[in-house]
Amino acid sequence: MSQIVTRFAPSPTGFLHIGGARTALFNWLYARHTGGKMLLRIEDTDRQRSTKEAIAAIIEGLEWLGITCDGDPIYQFARAERHRAAVEEMLAKGNAYRCYATPQELDEMRELARKEGRPPRYDGRWRDRDPSEAPKDRDPVIRLRAPQEGETVIDDMVQGTVTFPNKDLDDLVLLRSDGNPTYMLAVVVDDHDMGVTHVIRGDDHLTNAARQTQIYRALGWEVPRMAHIPLIHGPDGAKLSKRHGALGVDAYRDMGYLPAALRNYLVRLGWSHGDQEVFSTEEMVSFFDLDKVGRSAARFDFQKLESLNGHYMRASSDAELLSAIDALVPHLPDAEHRLARMTPERRAQLAAAMPGLKERAKTLVELVDNAEFIFVERPLPLDDKAAALLSPEARAHLARLVPALEQVEWTAAATEAAVRAYAEAQGVKLGAVAQPLRAALTGKPTSPPIFDVLMVLGRDESLARLKDQAA
């Protein structure tokens, strides 16, 4: 069997959509699973909406997710001459024809179809007209001479056998009157020339598959295998849209999700391997196959993604998380200020605090927020809950506790022993002392273990913060 070749073919009119990212992942996994290749084609024929920034965002998003394409990207617009040459082949074979119908005539066809309650279709009026009847003052479009009887059958690797009556498929336009190729034509020619053997894409392209199959046959080319995967819906069952939340991969990066976690989450949207939920990349490549992709739409569950991300954070080494934070910070609000604060000393403190921080955070952004106590300057700002913990009685405890802490060796065990001894001597529960201690040291009611915080901040900074809040 020849090598399997898949492709991901986004339109560069915006960010890398989360649905597109999953399509790219499925193409990549199938190619890697079969020892094949995955190619990237940028479908930039919409010149008004295609931008260099969008192309860069797509490539950057794929790289961030760990999806690597084979070879350089192929740009569809640059291949327009090749697309036109393919149409000339079809004209020469009699499988395409010139159509001179005016926009007004096409509007009338649509209106008649609407009145008769049927789908709008081109009526084929120029299909068999004598070329001598062609008006001299009008540039034609080129249409496919599609079969009018029988069926076009798609043997889809996910959807099964899908049949389209040819009477429902009209003679689609291949070249516009300005000579520019249509999407339908360009996709077929590019997939053929790129050697694509398997087209894996969203099931909203299923009708396109029938039309493109007809173009393949008109050109005398082998039709690739097709797999139309289910769309992603929001938690409410409606097609995923802006009202459900973030749509772009870049937004998930900026919210602090790890690429491995998002990759793992996306692979489970429509594909399964028993009851397993967490997969290493190696396991995904080993297990992935199209016969395990379901037909029904997958629902995007933000809470499940967050929980999975928390799992990946806890499983990451402290060094890996530090590197991930380094990559994230430039994308955060106030990035310049955050970068300026990341001195070698603060970085070392962040590394020391990481074991406790990663146990409590579900995203990198949450982790960075929880680590803010390392970076803030005195006097420490308190959030409302922390301020509420620092009652006059609590502040009095801090004032009496400081001298005891000043006398001990600065280790987690020694400071904990001193605080416990103080609470016992005062006849109060440990929480009555530890909670105000946490509020004074971090400005928040939650943090890594408080005695770890004392070690991260060090003796001088810890005592200074406690004195700031003591009565």
Curated annotation (Swiss-Prot):
It catalyses: tRNA(Glu) + L-glutamate + ATP = L-glutamyl-tRNA(Glu) + AMP + diphosphate. Residues 113-140 are annotated as: Disordered. The keyword Nucleus does not apply. A motif ('HIGH' region) lies at residues 10-20. A motif ('KMSKS' region) lies at residues 239-243. It comes from Xanthobacter autotrophicus (strain ATCC BAA-1158 / Py2). GO terms for biological process: glutamyl-tRNA aminoacylation. Monomer. It is found in: Cytoplasm. ATP binds at K242. Catalyzes the attachment of glutamate to tRNA(Glu) in a two-step reaction: glutamate is first activated by ATP to form Glu-AMP and then transferred to the acceptor end of tRNA(Glu). GO terms for cellular component: cytosol. CDD domains: GluRS_core. Its EC number is 6.1.1.17. GO terms for molecular function: ATP binding; glutamate-tRNA ligase activity; tRNA binding; zinc ion binding. Belongs to the class-I aminoacyl-tRNA synthetase family. Glutamate--tRNA ligase type 1 subfamily. It comes from the Bacteria. Keywords: Aminoacyl-tRNA synthetase, ATP-binding, Cytoplasm, Ligase, Nucleotide-binding, Protein biosynthesis. This is Glutamate--tRNA ligase 1.
